[in-house]
């Protein structure tokens, strides 16, 4: 039964892609490689475009131009998350229309990896139908950009510095070892940053709250292989439900990180 439901959901993604193209065309919406809007990428899982420009949010190197997400978030000061845009998501009218059209069966879209192997934006209309019906499998075969297997037993609960962090959690999407949905994230980002918001959305849907628009965008700087953090947005279709827009820091207290390579060291 679980496999049949999984295949059905995958087939419906193709029809959703067609619907989305029509909506975008009608609105004369131009979607560039650098936008954080919906990217219909279901058919290109694992594909690497020729361009090294990431499909998700990419921050220019220091001195070239200011990027609003990192500028708004500022430096890490001890909080795992900070509000962006007063907590108001940036979903477009077309994305909300898609959400209403897919409010029952759901929808998922994962941008292709860029030329450096980095993830882009992941967008979904989350419902009970997108949630998994079977236990999560192994993801150890996936090596996200900047990945290192390194441990600090005395500093980190769980010992290992890096986790394979799902942009859209398995418990929300049923997507497991999808390389377009996994980034190199610290244990702190995964547990203190992303998990509370993921559980909030999951509980909301399971308790009858209805469909939720959801987007997770890794934020890189220049050609760095490890994201500086994740921009996370959610909004329920029903008014008065769930809504947030936050930046989650990809840091680990007590550990220094070279975001260009993923190398790390103990801080004094």
Question: Positions of the model-derived regions?
Answer:
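Hydrophobic membrane-insertion alpha-helices, especially the h-region
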Residues: 16-30
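Intrinsically disordered, low-complexity segments enriched in polar/charged small residues
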Residues: 10, 14-19, 35
């Amino acid at each position: 039964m679980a496999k049949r439901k999984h295949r059905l959901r995958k087939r419906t993604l193709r029809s959703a892609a067609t619907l989305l193209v029509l909506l975008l065309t009608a609105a004369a919406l131009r979607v560039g490689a650098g936008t954080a809007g919906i990217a219909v990428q279901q058919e290109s899982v694992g594909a690497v475009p020729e361009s090294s420009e990431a499909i998700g949010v990419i921050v220019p190197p220091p001195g070239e131009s200011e990027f609003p997400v990192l500028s708004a978030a500022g430096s890490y000061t001890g909080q795992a998350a900070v509000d962006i845009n007063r907590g108001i998501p940036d979903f477009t009218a077309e994305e909300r229309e898609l959400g209403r059209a897919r409010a029952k069966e759901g929808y998922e879209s994962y941008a292709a990896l860029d030329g450096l192997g980095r993830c882009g934006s992941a967008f979904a209309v989350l419902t009970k139908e997108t949630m998994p019906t079977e236990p999560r499998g192994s993801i150890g075969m996936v090596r996200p950009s900047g990945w290192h297997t390194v441990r600090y037993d005395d500093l980190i609960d769980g010992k290992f510095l890096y986790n394979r962090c799902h942009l859209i959690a398995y418990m929300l999407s049923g997507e497991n070892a999808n390389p377009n949905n996994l980034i190199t994230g610290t244990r702190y980002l995964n547990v203190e940053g992303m998990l509370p918001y993921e559980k909030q959305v999951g509980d909301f849907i399971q308790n009858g709250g209805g469909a939720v628009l959801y987007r997770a965008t890794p934020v890189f700087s220049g050609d760095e292989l490890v994201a500086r953090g994740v921009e996370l947005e959610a909004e329920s279709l029903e008014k008065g439900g769930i809504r947030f827009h936050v930046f989650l820091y990809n840091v680990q207290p007590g550990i220094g990180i070279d975001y260009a390579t993923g190398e790390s060291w103990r801080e004094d």
